């Protein structure tokens, strides 16, 4: 918090009605917080770092570990230094791309480990968007696993830190109101929720309480299940509703 206070002016925007918004439970600012993987829930949260004139220096999709967030914010400060230099905007845009792509190799092994895509998001990309996704690192491995109904290795997918910088590099020094958030945040399922406020003393989700929890956003992947009826949810129905395999 001190890092943010000392280096940035922070604000939030409600994206509930935006076309790129995903879906999750409603979590108040005083609610519980839990750990998850970098880049989880990209449709629900986007962390923008802007120059005071509104130009996008960096954008991070979804949740980020605090240590890794500071790494990326430090990087954004260097991108801002580039933006503030004299010279043609075209030359600076080329450097923007180079900086974002080069920073991928500067990520620590621990950060990369924290940036593996959620398993249900990997399956969504492989089964629903195989021919269009940019999230797969080894297409042959994915296609072979799908054809043989085998396990898709985690290494067949790009980590979210790579996806982030590659997508940022496609929009160099774009004004905030022109940034294509739809394209940037579009990977995995649109619903992501860890039910932070419904964890019991054992660290497990209270399924009965979570079932009736208020939700916000639009679940574009939703299918009709017993969750749409008045029948009690089974354990499998609950997991399916929350995108958990």
Task: Go through each PLM region and give its residues.
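A short acidic/small-residue loop/turn micro-motif
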Residues: 63-65
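Non-globular targeting/processing and membrane-anchoring segments
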Residues: 68-245
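Thioredoxin-like thiol-disulfide oxidoreductase module
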Residues: 1-58, 74-76, 151, 155-173, ...
């Amino acid at each position: 918090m001190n890092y943010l206070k000392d280096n940035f002016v922070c604000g939030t925007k409600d994206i509930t009605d935006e076309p790129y918004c995903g879906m999750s439970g409603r979590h108040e600012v005083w609610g519980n917080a839990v750990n998850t993987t970098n880049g989880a829930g990209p449709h629900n949260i986007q962390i923008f770092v802007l120059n005071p004139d509104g130009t996008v220096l960096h954008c991070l999709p979804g949740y980020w570990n605090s240590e890794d967030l500071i790494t990326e914010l430090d990087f954004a400060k260097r991108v801002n230094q580039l933006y503030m230099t004299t010279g043609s905007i075209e030359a600076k845009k080329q450097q923007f791309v180079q900086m974002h792509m080069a920073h991928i190799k500067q990520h620590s092994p621990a950060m990369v480990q924290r940036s593996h895509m959620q398993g249900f998001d990997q399956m969504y990309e492989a089964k629903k968007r195989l021919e269009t996704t940019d999230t797969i690192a080894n297409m042959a491995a994915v296609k072979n696993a799908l054809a043989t109904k085998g396990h898709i290795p985690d290494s067949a997918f790009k980590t979210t830190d790579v996806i982030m910088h590659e997508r940022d590099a496609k929009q160099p020094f774009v004004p905030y109101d022109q940034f294509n958030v739809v394209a940037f945040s579009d990977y995995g399922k649109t619903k992501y929720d860890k039910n932070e406020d419904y964890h019991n003393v054992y660290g497990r989700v209270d399924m009965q309480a979570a079932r009736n929890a208020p939700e916000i956003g639009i679940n574009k992947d939703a299918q009709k299940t017993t969750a749409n009826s008045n029948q009690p949810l089974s354990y499998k129905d609950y997991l399916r509703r929350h995108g958990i395999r």
